[in-house]
Amino acid sequence: PTASHPAFARASGVVLANGETALTAAAHAAERQGYDATIVAVDVEGDAGTAGREHAALAERCVDIGEPASPPAVLLSGGETTVRLSEASAEPGVGGPNAEFVVRAGLALDHDSVVVPDVDTDGIDGASDAAGGIVDAETLTDEAAREALARHDTASLLADADALIRTGPTGTNVNDLRAVVVDPGVVASGAISDDPIDAPDPDAR
Protein backbone atom coordinates (compact mmCIF):
# COMPACT_ATOMS: atom_id res chain seq x y z
CA PRO A 1 0.00 0.00 0.00
CA THR A 2 0.99 3.59 -0.57
CA ALA A 3 1.22 6.34 2.02
CA SER A 4 -2.36 7.38 1.24
CA HIS A 5 -3.79 3.97 2.20
CA PRO A 6 -6.33 4.12 5.08
CA ALA A 7 -4.13 1.75 7.09
CA PHE A 8 -1.72 4.64 7.58
CA ALA A 9 -4.33 7.25 8.48
CA ARG A 10 -3.19 7.50 12.09
CA ALA A 11 0.45 6.59 11.53
CA SER A 12 3.24 9.10 11.92
CA GLY A 13 7.00 9.03 11.65
CA VAL A 14 9.54 10.72 13.86
CA VAL A 15 13.23 11.14 13.03
CA LEU A 16 15.14 10.73 16.29
CA ALA A 17 18.57 11.42 14.84
CA ASN A 18 20.31 11.96 11.52
CA GLY A 19 23.78 12.60 10.22
CA GLU A 20 23.74 16.21 11.31
CA THR A 21 22.80 15.11 14.84
CA ALA A 22 25.89 12.89 14.97
CA LEU A 23 28.13 15.64 13.59
CA THR A 24 26.83 18.17 16.09
CA ALA A 25 27.41 15.76 18.96
CA ALA A 26 30.94 15.07 17.69
CA ALA A 27 31.63 18.80 17.42
CA HIS A 28 30.49 19.38 21.00
CA ALA A 29 32.67 16.49 22.21
CA ALA A 30 35.69 17.94 20.39
CA GLU A 31 35.06 21.39 21.81
CA ARG A 32 34.98 19.96 25.33
CA GLN A 33 38.49 18.65 24.67
CA GLY A 34 39.68 22.12 23.66
CA TYR A 35 39.46 21.80 19.87
CA ASP A 36 38.12 24.35 17.42
CA ALA A 37 35.45 22.13 15.82
CA THR A 38 34.04 22.91 12.38
CA ILE A 39 31.44 20.94 10.42
CA VAL A 40 32.68 21.36 6.85
CA ALA A 41 29.94 19.28 5.15
CA VAL A 42 26.96 17.17 6.18
CA ASP A 43 26.34 15.36 2.88
CA VAL A 44 29.62 14.35 1.23
CA GLU A 45 28.93 11.98 -1.68
CA GLY A 46 30.80 10.54 -4.64
CA ASP A 47 34.13 8.74 -4.84
CA ALA A 48 35.68 7.89 -1.48
CA GLY A 49 39.24 8.38 -2.72
CA THR A 50 38.49 11.81 -4.11
CA ALA A 51 36.88 12.81 -0.83
CA GLY A 52 39.94 11.53 1.03
CA ARG A 53 42.26 13.72 -1.01
CA GLU A 54 40.00 16.74 -0.56
CA HIS A 55 39.85 16.30 3.22
CA ALA A 56 43.64 15.91 3.36
CA ALA A 57 43.95 19.18 1.44
CA LEU A 58 41.67 20.84 4.00
CA ALA A 59 43.93 19.55 6.76
CA GLU A 60 47.05 20.94 5.09
CA ARG A 61 45.31 24.30 4.66
CA CYS A 62 44.38 24.25 8.33
CA VAL A 63 48.01 23.64 9.29
CA ASP A 64 49.44 26.21 6.88
CA ILE A 65 47.07 29.17 7.24
CA GLY A 66 44.61 28.29 10.01
CA GLU A 67 41.61 27.93 7.69
CA PRO A 68 38.84 26.78 7.89
CA ALA A 69 39.77 26.41 11.58
CA SER A 70 42.74 27.27 13.74
CA PRO A 71 44.66 24.34 15.29
CA PRO A 72 44.14 22.50 17.49
CA ALA A 73 41.11 21.81 15.34
CA VAL A 74 38.71 19.09 14.27
CA LEU A 75 37.10 19.24 10.82
CA LEU A 76 33.98 17.07 10.61
CA SER A 77 31.91 15.79 7.70
CA GLY A 78 29.07 13.35 7.06
CA GLY A 79 27.25 11.80 4.12
CA GLU A 80 28.15 8.56 2.35
CA THR A 81 30.84 8.01 -0.26
CA THR A 82 31.20 5.08 -2.64
CA VAL A 83 33.91 2.93 -4.20
CA ARG A 84 33.86 2.16 -7.90
CA LEU A 85 35.62 -1.11 -8.64
CA SER A 86 38.04 -0.81 -11.53
CA GLU A 87 38.27 -3.33 -14.36
CA ALA A 88 41.82 -4.08 -13.26
CA SER A 89 40.48 -5.27 -9.94
CA ALA A 90 38.77 -8.48 -11.10
CA GLU A 91 39.01 -9.97 -7.62
CA PRO A 92 38.77 -7.05 -5.19
CA GLY A 93 40.03 -7.52 -1.68
CA VAL A 94 38.42 -6.54 1.61
CA GLY A 95 37.52 -2.92 2.10
CA GLY A 96 34.86 -0.26 1.99
CA PRO A 97 34.38 3.45 1.36
CA ASN A 98 35.62 4.49 4.80
CA ALA A 99 38.80 2.42 4.59
CA GLU A 100 39.41 3.69 1.06
CA PHE A 101 38.87 7.27 2.26
CA VAL A 102 41.47 7.09 5.02
CA VAL A 103 44.06 5.27 2.92
CA ARG A 104 43.77 7.87 0.17
CA ALA A 105 43.87 10.67 2.74
CA GLY A 106 46.98 9.16 4.32
CA LEU A 107 48.73 9.19 0.94
CA ALA A 108 47.99 12.89 0.54
CA LEU A 109 49.04 14.05 4.02
CA ASP A 110 52.36 15.84 4.47
CA HIS A 111 52.19 17.10 8.06
CA ASP A 112 52.63 14.73 10.98
CA SER A 113 50.22 16.79 13.10
CA VAL A 114 47.12 15.48 11.28
CA VAL A 115 45.11 12.34 12.08
CA VAL A 116 42.14 11.24 9.96
CA PRO A 117 39.54 8.74 11.23
CA ASP A 118 36.46 7.77 9.21
CA VAL A 119 33.72 5.36 10.32
CA ASP A 120 30.34 4.15 9.20
CA THR A 121 27.97 4.78 12.08
CA ASP A 122 26.32 1.37 11.65
CA GLY A 123 29.67 -0.25 12.48
CA ILE A 124 30.15 -1.99 9.13
CA ASP A 125 32.21 -0.52 6.31
CA GLY A 126 31.54 -2.16 2.96
CA ALA A 127 32.71 -5.78 2.76
CA SER A 128 34.81 -5.57 5.93
CA ASP A 129 34.00 -6.39 9.55
CA ALA A 130 35.21 -2.98 10.73
CA ALA A 131 33.53 0.41 11.01
CA GLY A 132 36.41 2.20 9.29
CA GLY A 133 39.97 3.25 9.96
CA ILE A 134 42.35 5.92 11.20
CA VAL A 135 45.63 7.16 9.71
CA ASP A 136 48.25 9.85 9.89
CA ALA A 137 51.01 10.67 7.42
CA GLU A 138 53.23 7.88 8.80
CA THR A 139 50.72 5.03 9.22
CA LEU A 140 51.14 3.54 5.75
CA THR A 141 53.91 3.38 3.17
CA ASP A 142 53.06 4.94 -0.18
CA GLU A 143 53.79 1.71 -2.04
CA ALA A 144 51.57 -0.44 0.17
CA ALA A 145 48.78 2.13 0.09
CA ARG A 146 48.80 2.38 -3.70
CA GLU A 147 48.79 -1.41 -4.08
CA ALA A 148 45.87 -1.76 -1.67
CA LEU A 149 43.91 0.97 -3.45
CA ALA A 150 44.47 -0.72 -6.81
CA ARG A 151 43.02 -3.97 -5.40
CA HIS A 152 40.44 -2.23 -3.18
CA ASP A 153 41.98 -4.20 -0.32
CA THR A 154 42.20 -1.24 2.02
CA ALA A 155 40.72 -2.88 5.13
CA SER A 156 43.37 -5.61 4.96
CA LEU A 157 46.09 -2.97 4.73
CA LEU A 158 44.70 -1.05 7.71
CA ALA A 159 44.41 -4.27 9.72
CA ASP A 160 48.10 -4.99 9.11
CA ALA A 161 48.89 -1.47 10.35
CA ASP A 162 46.69 -1.81 13.47
CA ALA A 163 44.67 1.08 12.06
CA LEU A 164 41.19 -0.40 11.76
CA ILE A 165 38.37 0.86 13.96
CA ARG A 166 36.10 -1.99 15.06
CA THR A 167 32.91 -1.29 16.98
CA GLY A 168 30.69 -4.16 15.96
CA PRO A 169 27.14 -3.45 14.74
CA THR A 170 25.85 -0.32 16.47
CA GLY A 171 22.13 -0.78 15.90
CA THR A 172 21.79 2.54 14.11
CA ASN A 173 22.88 4.21 10.88
CA VAL A 174 23.22 7.95 10.34
CA ASN A 175 25.70 7.73 7.46
CA ASP A 176 29.46 8.16 7.78
CA LEU A 177 31.33 10.26 10.31
CA ARG A 178 34.73 11.71 9.38
CA ALA A 179 37.02 13.75 11.57
CA VAL A 180 40.20 15.47 10.46
CA VAL A 181 42.15 16.17 13.66
CA VAL A 182 44.85 18.84 13.37
CA ASP A 183 46.92 18.83 16.56
CA PRO A 184 50.71 18.50 17.05
CA GLY A 185 50.03 16.26 20.05
CA VAL A 186 48.16 13.43 18.30
CA VAL A 187 49.43 10.20 16.73
CA ALA A 188 47.27 7.64 14.91
CA SER A 189 49.56 4.65 14.41
CA GLY A 190 48.85 1.78 16.77
CA ALA A 191 46.29 3.78 18.71
CA ILE A 192 43.23 1.65 17.95
CA SER A 193 42.55 -1.65 19.68
CA ASP A 194 41.71 -4.63 17.51
CA ASP A 195 39.14 -5.78 20.07
CA PRO A 196 35.50 -5.05 19.19
CA ILE A 197 33.56 -2.70 21.42
CA ASP A 198 30.30 -4.13 22.74
CA ALA A 199 27.52 -2.42 20.83
CA PRO A 200 24.28 -1.51 22.56
CA ASP A 201 21.35 -3.88 22.13
CA PRO A 202 18.82 -2.02 19.94
CA ASP A 203 16.00 -4.05 21.54
CA ALA A 204 17.03 -3.20 25.10
CA ARG A 205 14.60 -1.08 27.07
Model regions: which residues?
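Flexible loop/turn segments at secondary-structure boundaries
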Residues: 47-48, 83-85, 123-127
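Active-site proximal loops enriched in glycine and acidic residues that flank catalytic Cys/His/Asp
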Residues: 39-44, 77-79, 85-87, 118-120, ...
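Internal helix-turn-beta structural module
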Residues: 91-204
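Structural signal for hydrophobic packing residues in well-ordered secondary-structure cores
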Residues: 26-37, 55, 59-67, 109-110, ...
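Conserved mixed alpha/beta catalytic, RNA-binding, or beta-rich assembly cores of soluble enzyme
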Residues: 54-61, 71-109, 113
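Flexible, glycine/charged-enriched surface loops at secondary-structure junctions
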Residues: 1, 34-43, 64-74, 112-119
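Accessory alpha-helical/coil subdomains and C-terminal extensions
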Residues: 1-39, 44-52
